[in-house]
Amino acid sequence: MLEEINYDTKLFGLIGKNIKYTLSPYIHNFSFRTLGINAVYLVFDLDEMKFKRSISGILEIAEGLNVTIPYKDEVMKYLDNTDTHSTRIQAVNTIYKKSGYNTDYLAIKNLVRKKIKNVSGYECYIYGAGGAAKAAAFALSELGCSSISIVNRTKSRAYELAELLNKNGYNASIKENCNITNNILIVNSTPNSSVVPEDCVKKSDLVIEFVYRPVETELIKNAKKYGIQYINGLEILVNQAVEAEKIWFNKSVADEKIIEYLYARELVW
């Protein structure tokens, strides 16, 4: 955070509900200091009523925002425009001057490319059907996954996501759980990493975890146990934040430097 706030200080922040746990202020205020940017990043923890009453005002005064659960879908109707990716995904997690973007989508594409050069022919199982699941599903489909299988407790949400993907020309369906075959990618976008069976993990080629506290979730522990490649939630959180800063400032701090700072501050474990 800035030592001094003045007339020229720009306002950035995170909008969500029940987000006391978030690391976003630490990440972005560290980046602002490192980059020498006169800005401050705050948290707007809003219930549904407060969101409806305040969102228009926040959008007027903030230079840029991040959006998390449960408002990634709803915030779109308050924006002037959205980019191609967030329009197709129907979820926004980054805003710059009333324009919407999806950096979860960008982060998944960036990080998966580092692990597997070609995912063509892979079957992807996504646990969850919210905004993060949508971003992951579109990112993996565009990278070449042959099919997306949605596993979600609320079947209506799963059907909505599958229908959205199919309308965009991808191959999506609903499953009760994973079928153990070759060439599997697994994504957990739910708060509970134990939803993914261990048998599925040990047969997969890559595991993607959105939960970042603790960094080593049960899913990540199982991936390590069987020598499976993985992307942890902290990597996703930091990379999507870096992509947001590229949108806001056309520059950013390196992922590794941010992660090093978070561990040094003992904010992650």
Curated annotation (Swiss-Prot):
**Binding positions (NADP(+)):** G128, A129, G130, G131, A132, N152, R153, T154, K155, S156, R157, F210, G233
GO biological process assignments:
amino acid biosynthetic process; aromatic amino acid family biosynthetic process; chorismate biosynthetic process; shikimate metabolic process
Question: Which residues are responsible for catalysis?
Answer: K72 (proton acceptor)
What are the disulfide bonds?
none
Keyword Amino-acid biosynthesis set for record: yes
Q: Which UniProt keywords apply?
A: Amino-acid biosynthesis, Aromatic amino acid biosynthesis, NADP, Oxidoreductase
The pathway entry for this protein reads as: Metabolic intermediate biosynthesis; chorismate biosynthesis; chorismate from D-erythrose 4-phosphate and phosphoenolpyruvate: step 4/7
Q: Which InterPro entries does this entry report, sorted A to Z?
A: Aminoacid_DH-like_N_sf, NAD(P)-bd_dom_sf, Shikimate_DH-bd_N, Shikimate_DH_fam, Shikm_DH/Glu-tRNA_Rdtase
Q: Which domain of life is it from?
A: Archaea
- The entry marks the following residues as binding shikimate, namely T22, L23, S24, T68, N93, D104, Y212
Enumerate the catalysed reactions.
shikimate + NADP(+) = 3-dehydroshikimate + NADPH + H(+)
Q: What is its EC number?
A: 1.1.1.25
Subunit structure and binding partners: Homodimer.
Q: What does this protein do?
A: Involved in the biosynthesis of the chorismate, which leads to the biosynthesis of aromatic amino acids. Catalyzes the reversible NADPH linked reduction of 3-dehydroshikimate (DHSA) to yield shikimate (SA).
The record's similarity note reads: Belongs to the shikimate dehydrogenase family.
Name of this protein: Shikimate dehydrogenase (NADP(+))
